[in-house]
Structures are given as C-alpha cells and as structure tokens.
From Swiss-Prot:
One of its GO terms (molecular function) is receptor ligand activity. The keyword Transmembrane helix does not apply. Disulfide bonds: none annotated. This is Chemokine-like protein TAFA-2. One of its GO terms (cellular component) is cytoplasm. One of its GO terms (biological process) is visual learning. Pfam families: TAFA. Residues 1-30 form the signal peptide.
Length: 131
C-alpha cells in the first residue's frame, strides 16, 4: 500500500471517530437534560444502574437514586424498590422495619448492622448501605 493511501485511510478513520464522539456527547447531554426533572415529593426514582460480576461469579449491582422525601423521611427501600422511609429506621439501623424484601422473602439484619439480606429458599440477596 502506498504511503498516501494510508494517510487518507487514517484521516478518514479519525474523522469518523470525531463524528462518533461528538454525536455521543450530544446524546449524553440530552440524557442528562431529561434527568434534571423534579421528583414528586414522597417518591424516589433510579437515575443510574451499575451491574457486574466478580471473580466468584457473584453478581454485584448498585444504583443511584434521587428521592424527594417528606420531612422526617429519608431514602430507603421498600419491597426491593427505592422509597422514602421514616428517618428513625435508618438512624437506628432497623433495616427490616422498612420492609426491604419482596413478599415471601425473609429479612435479616447483617451482623455488622451495615445492611440486610433477603432470603427465599437457597437464594440470598444481600444489601450493604453505603453513604
């Protein structure tokens, strides 16, 4: 291949990459614009989800939630969904009082009180609270 051909091919690829990056930036900007809307008082919504597997093939999930709670309430979990719960539940770490598990699952506070587990049969879902 000639040197001139390689230069044109490289220039073409570079232009395509710049176009894709520019287009992607506009899509992300547009998506962020839609996220800025107000959450109804007393409700929560998921604004970002993250999911991966570690080397032990255990699936790890995390989410970012936006809540607008009434006075005396904070962000929590009810029936495996983000919700506003009484602040004393979180302050006292009485996690199972906010009913975080699905119907039919058993809730247990973790020994270090930094979260809870929901179990049904041999399936266990563990949630750790991070601030």
């Amino acid at each position: 291949m000639s040197k001139r051909y390689l230069q044109k091919a490289t220039k073409g690829k570079l232009l395509i990459i710049i176009f894709i990056v520019t287009l992607w930036g506009k899509v992300v900007s547009s998506a962020n614009h839609h996220k800025a809307h107000h959450v109804k008082t007393g409700t929560c919504e998921v604004v970002a989800l993250h999911r991966c597997c570690n080397k032990n093939k255990i699936e790890e999930r995390s989410q970012t939630v936006k809540c607008s709670c009434f006075p005396g309430q904070v962000a929590g979990t009810t029936r495996a969904a983000p919700s506003c719960v009484d602040a004393s539940i979180v302050e006292q770490k009485w996690w199972c009082h906010m009913q975080p598990c699905l119907e039919g699952e058993e809730c247990k506070v973790l020994p270090d009180r930094k979260g809870w587990s929901c179990s049904s049969g041999n399936k266990v879902k563990t949630t750790r609270v991070t601030h």
